[in-house]
Amino acid sequence: EAALTAAKAIHYVGAGTVEFIADPADNFYFLEMNTRIQVEHRVTEMLTGQDLVEWQFRIADGEQVPLQQKQITLRGHAIEVRLYAENPARNFVPSPGLVHHLRLPKDKPGLCIDNSLNVGDEVTPYYDPMIAKIIAWGGDRKDALHAIKRALNETQVAGVKTNVQLLSQIVRHPEFRDGNYNTGFIALHQDTLMAQSVSASDLVLALGTLFILLKRKEKISGTVVDTKDPYSPWNEEDSWRLNLPAQDVIQLMDGGREIDVEVTFIPGGYHLSLPNSSMTVSGALVGESDVEAILGGIQIKGTVALNGHELNLWLYDVNHILKLRDRALALDAVADTVDNLSAPMPGRITQVMVGEGTVVRSGALLMVLEAMKMEHNIIAPSNGKVEKLNFSVGDWVDENTMLLDFSPVI
């Protein structure tokens, strides 16, 4: 009623959003009116069954408002989350970059996805970093929460950091579930909501290792000699040894934990020695990122997105991030070195940590670029040697400019 009174007082006709702020005693106070459709218009549309964008076009074309307020009924409950390319762990600093993997829930009754981003698109630093909206409807708030949880479980993004994990934590928090929240909710529950990811389980490590082995096999399948003998050493991917099983080591990083997974090649699969167990694994790639596998006798379907030396894994709706070390970088790090050593956005070089001829290990800090009052670290994508520095401290560089020449060592 207060919103209608405000609109009538200024003879406003069209879509608009009136905002109020409420106190704990349910007193509310006028905040502002935006004379336009807002980001949250989908919530109203789901509750009313009306298309507000269509309304706005019709009104702009001179037509009358399609319905009067008394003709509009509200049904159910709707919740909207905004998916942002940002890093909650660093005070929500924007995370520009290329999107290498994107999988969003599909539209269906009770669920709406607003998105214009595709794999290969760039999230730039010049605009608001929102990349999608997910809106879920239910007969009541409990049903809507269940729907939004399920939708967030199905959301996968790699290449840029996002707030998807934070959103999942919020909608699962008991205080939020019970409606006990306000604008200080995140700060109040920061320790819970921003909790660091738990260490990857052996099952996750096995999935990541299997993915690397399958990708390696796929990568060299066109270069080996086909002898028609599946047990011929010339048909093995790597590490063949006379009179002994072929073995290899896949070197991973889980947060700050270095992990060496010992691999023994066996007919039809691999035997893995993991930190807390050993297991036999086998499987196949389905498309670019999906893996159908048997891990230690457990049949699973997982998703793995490889971006340079970083592995994003989704298993049982949980996202884990592993990094490849040393030889495992041979898959893609060399190909991605150029991208990793170019300026992510226009900015000024503030620090140079290496000189020409410096030999560095993977992950070493090479340069610091300042842009939009934020620092961006330029990291060595693999073990290697700095061949040439193209810029010095104080130099201004344009986006995608190659900052240095680097020779990887695999």
Regions found by a protein language model. Name each.
Residues 3, 21, 38, 42-278, ...:
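Catalytic cores of soluble metabolic enzymes centered on carboxylation/carboxyl-transfer
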Residues 8-15, 62-70, 300-301:
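Active-site phosphate-binding and catalytic loops of NTP-dependent enzymes
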Residues 12-38:
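Conserved metal-phosphate-binding beta-hairpin within the catalytic cores
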Residues 69-75, 185, 190, 318-343:
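Long, charged amphipathic helices and adjacent flexible linkers at domain junctions
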Residues 80, 90, 295-324:
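Structured, non-catalytic alpha/beta "coupling" segments that mediate domain-domain communication
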Residues 279-297:
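A conserved acidic, glycine/proline-rich C-terminal tail/linker
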Residues 331-410:
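Structured functional modules or segments
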